[in-house]
Amino acid sequence: MKKILVLGAGAMGSAFTVPCLDNENAVSLIGTHLEDKFIDQMMQNDNFHPVLKCKLPSKLKLKRFEKFAEEFKEKPDLIVLGVNSKGIDWAGNEISKYYTSEIPILLLTKGLTIIDNQYETIAEKLKRILEKNGLKKINISAVGGPCLAAGLTNKVKSSVVLANQNIDIVKSIGKMISTNYYSTEFSDDLIGVEVCAAVKNIYSMIIGASRGLCSSSASEEIK
C-alpha cells in the first residue's frame, strides 16, 4: 500500500482520489487554505462532493489544510497537485516547507504561464519555485489527456498520458494509479505533453463557448 497525498479539493483533485483508492492506496485529500469550509461540509455530509454531486469513497481521508504538515511525518510516496494554475505559487511555497528530495510530484494542473516574455509550463514554474526555496533533486511529472472529473468519479473509461523526463518514474506512478477504467500511457516529453494539454483546453473552451452562443436558450446579453 502506497501513501498518496492530494492537495486541492476541487473537482479533478477529488475525482483523482477514486482510482488511487481503488488501487488500494492510503489516500489523503487536503483542501487548500481557502477550502476549509468546503472540507468541513464534505465531512459533515458523508464525503458528498457538492460540485461532483456524488459521494467520494469512505476510505478517503478528508483533511483541512492545517493538517498538511502532519502528512509529512510519514513520507508520502506521491504528492498530487490539484490546485488551479493561479494557486501554483502558493502550493509550491507550502510544499517547499516539508518536501524532501525525490518525492514524486504529479501535476493535475494544466496551463501555461509567462516569465520574462516567454512561455513557461506549470512543471517548469513549480520547479523554479522549489529551487528558489533551496530544494534540489526535484521530481515533477504531469498528466495530460481527455479525462473529465465527473467521468472519472463515475469510473467512465479514460486514458491519460503521464510525462516525466525519466520515463521510469511515470511508469512507477502508473502502477500506483492505473485501473481498468483509468488507463495510463507514458512519455518522456514533459514539455510537449503539458503544452498539448494546455492548447487542447483552449480549443475546448472555444468550442464550448461557440455551442453556448448558438444555443436557442442563450440570452441576447450573453450573445
Model regions and ranges:
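Internal alpha-helical scaffold of NAD(P)-dependent oxidoreductase catalytic cores
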Residues: 98, 132-139, 157-223
